[in-house]
């Protein structure tokens, strides 16, 4: 779903540009997102990939897990259900903050991955690493399982 007050379609009907857009979506697994973008348009004048800049929004990974996102640029592939945040991003939760260059939300597989360096900040310290995979934990009380590797550095306050 896209909401906007300013929608421009090319003369051939094959391109579009939306200013001050709100995008939202959900799937059968309970994932949902609400994103605000300064501008959105399709990539290479083809759907299903939509690009946006100056992104802010909320993502519900499950009924218990809610995060806020900020990014310079986002791409949403509506066919594969993948959201890519890049050009600098922040993911914020009441327990942690994740900062990096690029990250992928795969709503079909219910995973979050990054192959770029990132910093994971929490109340007692920080973890820096080169790769990240976040998956839903089998133990529902633990929320998410963070797998960080490739040059991990940990700072922890006792």
Annotated model-derived regions:
Residues 1-158:
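Mature-chain termini and adjacent capping regions
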